[in-house]
Amino acid sequence: MMGIRIAIDGPASSGKSTVAKIIAKKLGYVYLDTGAMYRSATYLALQNDTDLTDERAIVKLLKDYPISFGRRKDDSEQLVFVGNVEVSHPIRENEVTNNVSTVAALPLVRKTLVDLQQQLAKKGGIVMDGRDIGTVVLPDAELKIFLIASVEERAERRYRENLEKGIQTDFNTLKKEIAERDYKDSHRKISPLKPAADAITFDTTGIDIAGVVNFIEKKAQNIIDRS
């Protein structure tokens, strides 16, 4: 039987990527980080001194340097490539983070990447996370989850992540950047950040990863058992 499609959406640092990876591994599904795709497009534009509002130029870069995914030999980490270059860590740098909302709002860039995402999800058995998976990319996904958390908590998570990576950041600056990104993502004209009408909204403030995973896994298993 073909596996179900699970859409996990939410704002920056809501825990969606961490949770989606674990859910995919538990179910034996494919995990697709759509945010990494928009980050890769932003990275390409920055590296090639391309105007971040020039959607045709960025789409051409995406065709010249196709985005692909792989895994480390020990299966510990998903790797992201543009062309033949591995960019898993560079696409997480602050310069990319602070500009990705601009690139992600470009209609042609969104169409190019959404088409690819939908193609990858056709066979089912996939967990996809992003900001418009349940509303645009997989509107007919069998399970849609929308994760939220307070700005304070999300800034704390990002702060800890950066420290672990050796990146020095100011906590208050992170809070400001996250709040600004929330505004940009939820107010853009194309695919704004919002829960699908049939999505389950889950507030992860004060809840650890295991608790969130357990909640989603139970929902998924109920659907799988009924299929």
From Swiss-Prot:
It comes from the Bacteria. The keyword Transferase applies. Keywords: ATP-binding, Cytoplasm, Kinase, Nucleotide-binding, Transferase. It is an enzyme of class 2 (transferase). GO terms for biological process: nucleobase-containing small molecule interconversion; pyrimidine nucleotide metabolic process. SUPFAM superfamilies: P-loop containing nucleoside triphosphate hydrolases. Its EC number is 2.7.4.25. InterPro entries: Cytidylate_kin, Cytidylate_kinase_dom, P-loop_NTPase. The keyword tRNA-binding does not apply. Signal peptide: none annotated. It catalyses: CMP + ATP = CDP + ADP; dCMP + ATP = dCDP + ADP. ATP binds at G10, P11, A12, S13, S14, G15, K16, S17, T18. One of its GO terms (molecular function) is ATP binding. HAMAP family: Cytidyl_kinase_type1. PANTHER family: CYTIDYLATE KINASE, CYTIDYLATE KINASE/PANTOATE-BETA-ALANINE LIGASE. Belongs to the cytidylate kinase family. Type 1 subfamily. This is Cytidylate kinase. It comes from Streptococcus mutans serotype c (strain ATCC 700610 / UA159).
